[in-house]
Structures are given as C-alpha cells and as structure tokens.
Amino acid sequence: MSKVTVLNDKFEKASELDLPAKYAEVNPHNLYLYVKSYLASLRANTAHTKGRSDVSGGGKKPWRQKGRGGARAGSTRTNVWVGGAVAFGPKNNRNYFQKVNKKQKRLALERALEDKAAKNALFSVDSLSIESGKTKDANAVIKKLGLKDVLIVKDLLDEKTLLAFRNLANCYVVDVNEVNAYLVSVFNAVIIEKAALESIVKEG
C-alpha cells in the first residue's frame, strides 16, 4: 500500500496518508490502454496523399501499346511516374479514436495515482490557492517544495490560481473533474488538494 505525503500550510511534510489498497491491485495494462487512447485522440490527422482517382490528368494513354521499343504505359499518373499518384498513401479521413469505457478510465487513474505514490511523488495539501494571482508567488511555492514538472489538482479551480500558474513552464493546474491518468503519469510530481483526493477516492 503506497502512501500520500501530506503537507501543512507551510508546505512541509506533516504526515502520510494511505491510498486504498485496491489501487495497487489494478492491472497496469489499463493505464497503458488509456494513455494509448488519449494520445490517439490528439492526432491531428493532417497527412494526406492523392491516389489514382484523385490526381488530375493521365486519362489518355501516353503512347501506343506496341512498336516504340519502350515500356508500355496506360497513364502518366501511375505511382511509378514523377507527378503521378501515391499508392497506399495516408488519407485525412482516417479516424484514430480508440474506445475506453468509464470503468477502464477509472482504473487507469487509480493505477496512475498508485504509481506516483510509490515513487513518493504524490502530495496532498488542504488548499493551494494563489489569491494574488501573481506568477511570482506561484513560483515561490514550487521552489519551496523543490519540485519540477508538477501537476496541481484543485477541488475547485479559481481564476486567480489559474493565472498565477499559467505562465510557469513546469506547472499545470487542473480541476479535479478534468484530471485523468495521462496527466498524472506525464508529470514528475502531483500535488492534489485534500478535498480533491477525497472526491477521487469516494468515486471509486
């Protein structure tokens, strides 16, 4: 059973909190499938080539079939000719969507949290709000924790906190309703508000 490091108001280690034991029993393959699906959904699908039916021209046979001494040809737009079509090239009408059901998404998040806790990279705090909305104040918090590449999960994301962290390259703030297994996995450390963590555990 992995533990969550609980921080006090000064962002110093105060205690530890146990994650539910079932999180450690989740098959890591669920996390793999979710991340694979998530990344597939981000694909821009812009690669596109023209096939024989798409290119212009080439309707007329360039020369007679026999008698010239050269290779026979039926069109100037075959894939072996310069300026011709592309054989079996990519099309931009392809759908990369990969279905992952709700239960699998849930299991993936549980496994991601378990993995972070096992690496001592999952932290909980009562509240993490930057009332001033200043990036300088947000950066001071991150420096005090000595963390790099941090995901911050808030129970209720307020605009001031979002503005404060938005311009920090090594931080990303997200509401608990928008957090997913990919985000938890891709960051080196996760700071989650106590209420947000309780909400995630309760849903499970």
Swiss-Prot record:
GO terms for biological process: translation. This is Large ribosomal subunit protein uL4. The lineage of its organism: Bacteria, Pseudomonadati, Campylobacterota, Epsilonproteobacteria, Campylobacterales. It comes from Campylobacter lari (strain RM2100 / D67 / ATCC BAA-1060). Belongs to the universal ribosomal protein uL4 family. Disulfide bonds: none annotated. One of the primary rRNA binding proteins, this protein initially binds near the 5'-end of the 23S rRNA. It is important during the early stages of 50S assembly. It makes multiple contacts with different domains of the 23S rRNA in the assembled 50S subunit and ribosome. GO terms for cellular component: ribonucleoprotein complex; ribosome. The keyword RNA-binding applies. Keywords: Ribonucleoprotein, Ribosomal protein, RNA-binding, rRNA-binding. One of its GO terms (molecular function) is rRNA binding.
